[in-house]
């Protein structure tokens, strides 16, 4: 019985879509397969160009011919994707920029530009920011000045700006870009810089009626205002704000705060710091309808300090919590869980840098009625605070189905010794305690 060559039975249109998932250098290699495949790569509706592969100056002419040949084959039909990684060692930046303009004019849908250069390229060009076909735009290490024209990107859904340098009107540039994207759904901003001072932009306003996902990566203090009624996913990573204003968060499903301190501007919360207390209170209240939360240990440290001075709102919709508890923030655990009365899943990253004298007395409502799955990471064998923590869940969780304990160092002999230290009787008879 002859083997069937399923690949060669596929039409060219489907094969080129498959090759689109490969880097261009890999799709070119398929040309040696057979006569049919010789020029098939030229019809792939995407180009992934990695300029570091052409560091030899003598390769420049060949590279330009390669690009021209590819564009001649593809510009008659619309390209779907163009990705370029440019390194300073090459001497043909202008040719690359001309190529980018050409692919935009050809109706590109997905444009990704990564410029690894010391002198950033000015990337404000009318044909790019008035494209009627761009669906996603990702830029790295380029310069964006305030455009003297109206930005219009009617199809753009994904905008990712990484280490972008702006002029003195930096915040206005971002606002213009966002306002010119009427169907924008996914926005990511990573360390935006002022081109004159090299300082991170200190003020940012994000206003969009269509935005669903927002990720902010800031390294220094600043202010941010967010007005996005359809926002479902929000992430702050290494971001610190001395002022944060969010509104219209009724659609928010998930929030992730992975930062040293998102509210920091001069140390931990103090009683004489009413402005900071108000910022935290307003922020927590607005996000209190969230269902899924990931939060860092540094933020919990701040919340522990805040809980002594103010109130933590009820997160009544929260069913999944992933949090890092270490140091004094571990004392916040019962209080924080009390604010999550319907919590079902809890993932804890536990860190005991020193022996903490923890003594839990309160039993939150979620332990009695809803908490079914607890996963504790980074436990240490024979470390007393961790043992108390595990015993706390065992003896107080009425509906717990699975308690998973993950140790930094683990052996089967040690696990048996650890089990003997768990002296509490399981309140939930069906609970499984799993060591990994």
Swiss-Prot record:
InterPro entries: F-box-like_dom_sf, F-box_AtFBL13-like, F-box_dom, FBD, FBL13/AtMIF1-like, LRR_dom_sf, LRR_FXL15/At3g58940/PEG3-like
CDD domains: F-box_AtFBL13-like
Sections of the chain in a coiled coil: none
PROSITE patterns linked: FBOX
Keyword set, alphabetical order: Leucine-rich repeat, Repeat
Domain FBD: 355-407
Annotated ranges, domain F-box: 4-50
Pfam families the UniProt entry points to: F-box, FBD, LRR_At5g56370
SUPFAM superfamilies according to UniProt: F-box domain (SSF81383), RNI-like (SSF52047)
UniProt LRR repeat ranges: 287-310, 397-420
Gene3D superfamilies: Ribonuclease Inhibitor (3.80.10.10)
Stored PANTHER family: F-BOX/RNI SUPERFAMILY PROTEIN-RELATED (PTHR31900), PROTEIN WITH RNI-LIKE_FBD-LIKE DOMAIN (PTHR31900:SF33)
Protein name, as recorded: Putative F-box/FBD/LRR-repeat protein At5g44960
Organism this protein belongs to: Arabidopsis thaliana
Classification of source organism: Eukaryota, Viridiplantae, Streptophyta, Embryophyta, Tracheophyta
